[in-house]
Amino acid sequence: MTELVNITELLLSRIRDVRDYPEPGVVFKDITPLLADPAAFTALTGALAELTVRHGATKIVGLEARGFILGAPAAVQAGVGFIPVRKAGKLPGATLSQSYDLEYGSAEIEVHAEDLVAGDRVMVVDDVLATGGTAEASLQLIRRAGAEVAGVSVLMELGFLGGRARLEPALAGAPLEALLQI
């Protein structure tokens, strides 16, 4: 318990609030100070790796873009493969895609078709769970590829945006782990 409290305090101390960014009234949670601190970054990726191992994942999917920064080193520490999930049109070759709705419009994410297969247990890693749209689409994409969802792990969950409630049906019993609740 003390170790978790210490990690929580360390992570929180390295996240900067930027008021009125990207627009007035928004408080942006800037993780770049955390990434610049080797002790904090190592603690974060170590915690994500531990969750990956605990839930029996064989691969980590990192969501563009900060999910790449967190997911790749966590995958190395956990001894599992890393798969980037990109915005549509960014991956060469054969891909699987999944569209999802945004507040005003829609978006699409992709993964290389051969990167996820039956028998894979996949942990989704990202920096923030906000509304849950991208995470929900990634879970659909993982299952369409024939793989199993081991869970979703994020640095922080912005609870007031309702992402957890949106994800619950798509998780189908898989865990959602947030290191920080904001």
From Swiss-Prot:
Annotated Pfam families: Pribosyltran
Database matches in CDD domains: PRTases_typeI
EC number: 2.4.2.7
UniProt-annotated location(s): Cytoplasm
PROSITE patterns: PUR_PYR_PR_TRANSFER
Cellular component GO terms held in the UniProt record: cytoplasm
Keyword Nucleotide-binding: no
EC class (word): transferase
Record key words, sorted: Cytoplasm, Glycosyltransferase, Purine salvage, Transferase
GO BP terms in the entry: adenine salvage; AMP salvage; purine ribonucleoside salvage
Catalytic activity: AMP + diphosphate = 5-phospho-alpha-D-ribose 1-diphosphate + adenine
Coiled coil: none
GO MF annotation, one: adenine binding
Pathway named in the protein's UniProt entry: Purine metabolism; AMP biosynthesis via salvage pathway; AMP from adenine: step 1/1
Signal peptide bounds: none
Top-rank taxon, per record: Bacteria
Function as written in the Swiss-Prot or TrEMBL entry: Catalyzes a salvage reaction resulting in the formation of AMP, that is energically less costly than de novo synthesis.
Family statement drawn from the similarity comment of this UniProt entry: Belongs to the purine/pyrimidine phosphoribosyltransferase family.
Quaternary structure and partners: Homodimer.
The protein, known as: Adenine phosphoribosyltransferase
Lineage: Bacteria, Bacillati, Actinomycetota, Actinomycetes, Kitasatosporales
